[in-house]
């Protein structure tokens, strides 16, 4: 998403934790992300299908070009900050397909192995017609879909205060049920770039974004987290490994 996030990502990868990394390919810093991932081919890489741009003063637009998908962008040519704002603009589904296809093709051209797709802010699967389109594209390109392998999605540490994120992650490990669980994390470093980000979708955005993302990085790379995994006999696997174990044909649309 940004240079600060990429620095945090590299630190997480170098810690040795098996991770799956979802890339915002319309984002300004995606090429740096790709460079990092090329140095670490064991990392499972996904496309964070993106139809929104939510950060004040730090925005992105379509890979396919603003003039190609005019119903997906605001007056300034950027993605709308929320799924609701996009839907109010009555997006042309053909343009949604054009853009998602462009993101997938950019990812495949990048030179890193792409294993799966997931969904920035959930928008690519939030409406029935969007979900059906995303499913069709995943099948066409032979990609896994996050949430389609029976995984339980977890991210309780996101809203915990920076100093409490370690406690939140350990508590999550302690209550995990048998099966596949995805812990959705957002890492970064505590610097001015990341600290300036404000979510436009709420009057009460998560404060001190840089400290929160540094807190997640610190929690994930802490000896305490590693010990909790060992104590509970929790095995970390990537989406690449999950797909290898279950196969793409095992994918099922999640209930609800």
List each language-model region with its residue ranges:
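Histidine/acidic-residue-rich catalytic or RNA/ligand-binding cores of hydrolases
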Residues: 5-6, 56-61, 130-131, 158-165, ...
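Acidic (Asp/Glu)-rich catalytic clusters
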Residues: 9-16, 30-44, 61-74, 109, ...
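Structural preference for beta-strand elements that scaffold enzyme active sites
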Residues: 18-20, 42-48, 114-118, 144, ...
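Active-site beta-loop-alpha junctions enriched in small/polar residues
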Residues: 24-26, 48-54, 122, 150-153, ...
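Active-site gating loops and adjacent loop-to-helix segments of metal-dependent hydrolytic enzymes
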Residues: 58-87, 198-209
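Catalytic domains of cell-wall/extracellular-matrix polysaccharide-remodeling enzymes
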Residues: 90-170, 174
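Aromatic-lined glycan-binding groove of carbohydrate-active enzymes
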Residues: 134, 142-144, 170-195, 237
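C-terminal domain-boundary segment and adjacent tail
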Residues: 145-148, 202-256
């Amino acid at each position: 998403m940004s240079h600060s996030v990429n620095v945090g990502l590299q630190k997480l990868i170098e810690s040795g934790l098996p991770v799956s990394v979802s890339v915002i390919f319309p984002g300004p810093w995606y090429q740096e992300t790709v460079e990092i991932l090329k140095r670490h081919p064991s990392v499972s890489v996904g496309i964070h299908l993106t139809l929104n741009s939510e950060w004040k003063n730090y925005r992105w637009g379509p890979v396919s070009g603003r003039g190609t998908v005019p119903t997906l962008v605001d007056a300034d040519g950027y993605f709308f900050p929320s799924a609701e704002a996009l839907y109010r603009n009555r997006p042309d589904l053909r343009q949604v397909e054009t853009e998602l296809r462009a993101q997938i093709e950019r990812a495949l051209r990048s030179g890193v192995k792409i294993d799966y797709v997931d969904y920035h802010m959930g928008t690519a699967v939030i409406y029935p017609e969007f979900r059906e389109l995303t499913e069709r594209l995943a099948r066409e390109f032979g990609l896994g879909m996050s949430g389609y392998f029976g995984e339980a999605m977890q991210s309780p540490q996101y809203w915990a205060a920076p100093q409490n994120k370690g406690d939140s992650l350990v508590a999550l490990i302690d209550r995990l049920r048998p099966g596949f669980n995805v812990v959705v994390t957002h890492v970064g470093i505590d610097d001015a770039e990341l600290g300036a980000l404000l979510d436009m979708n709420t009057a009460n955005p998560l404060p001190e974004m840089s400290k929160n993302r540094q807190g997640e990085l610190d929690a994930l790379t802490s000896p305490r987290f590693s010990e909790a995994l060992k104590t509970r006999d929790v095995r970390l696997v990537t989406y690449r490994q999950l797909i290898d174990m279950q196969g793409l044909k095992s994918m099922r649309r999640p209930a609800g």
